[in-house]
Amino acid sequence: MEYSKRIQDKIVDSGKTIIQTMKLMDDGFTKSLIVFNNGRFVGIITNGDLQRAIIAKIPFDTPILKVVDNKTKRYASVTDDREKIKTWMLEKRAELMPILDEEGNLSDVIFWKDLFSDDKIEDNRKKIDLPVVIMAGGKGTRLNPLTNVIPKPLVPVGEKTILEVIMDQFEGIGCHKFYMSVNYKADMVKYYLSQLEHKYDIEFFQEDKPLGTIGSVSLLKGRITTPFFVSNCDSINEQDYRDVYDYHVSNHNDLTIVTMVKSFKIPYGVIETGEDGLMVALSEKPELTYQVNTGVYILNPSCIEEIPKGEFFHITDLMEKTKTRGGRVGCFPVSEHAWKDMGEWREYLKLIKVL
């Protein structure tokens, strides 16, 4: 059957792998694709399906046919009226809705913008009011010479600063209380925030010497009694952090790391050798996939007790300490295009060019 271009652009073959499908979603700026197998409709695959597969340690090169989960999906039939379909799409916040005929074949697809005037999918999810700790005290040396003049939190991104973009994202999901660790050019950061028309609920705390990537959080002992977010001041994610919190709670984690799925293609043939230098295997221009740390976390309040007061202590030290005592450190993956590292010149320039 011939489909319109906008439907064809959303179709992915069931033989595509998890990592290939993540890239297709990134390139198409979409979180849902329509899966076909040998010309027949199989189902919808979402970004959330791929994230759950990665969390479950399903290999990145697994075909998505093994990942499609129709038990959690709802599809419309040609006999359903538009008001019913509209209600379903609102309930699921669905980007698109397949319309199936009596034999289960794809007849049409209704997109969000076909039914709603606002292109932005309505957010009817429950808000979460968790504390947010922002690590804003670093020197931002990777952005020199700009950060010789202004601190990294105040580096502009469009009409806002990096700091405002990060805080606005958390406020958007219901978080209102911010604890901000400051050190380098602290007075400038405080003054700027005090002059904003929008007043954030911020408590500042300041280390009197460098304490590593998490050491200053020891100063918050006794002040935070619920799970809380920690964010570096250069990490912008397009991920809804409520999904991360849901995973953190359901997986009974002590600490959850938001990771980014990153692929590296080696432009050479890679040779594996054994004893006496004999070749064991050859991979021609292999693509390697890893999860890398984005600098955003959820911590249980008990983690604060693990951070030694007044000592230099990295978040990686906290991860190891938590694991050593038998705690759970989880990883929640986001796609490569979902994360922007604003602390690195190339990524920063790429973003402001888009804006």
Model-derived segments and spans:
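Short beta->alpha transition motifs characteristic of CBS
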Residues: 27, 34, 41-55, 98, ...
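Catalytic-core segments of class I nucleotidyltransferases/pyrophosphorylases
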Residues: 228-229, 236, 242-249, 262-265, ...
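N-terminal glycine-rich phosphate-binding loop and ensuing alpha1 helix
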Residues: 124-189, 352
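Short acidic/polar active-site loop segments enriched in Thr and Asp
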Residues: 31, 95, 176, 226, ...
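Conserved N-terminal catalytic core of the sugar/cofactor nucleotidyltransferase
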Residues: 55, 160-233, 243, 273, ...
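Bateman (tandem CBS) regulatory domains
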Residues: 1-10, 16-17, 62-73, 147-150, ...
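A short, conserved acidic/glycine-rich loop-to-beta-strand motif
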Residues: 251-261
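The conserved cystathionine-beta-synthase
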Residues: 10-29, 36-37, 54, 74-94, ...
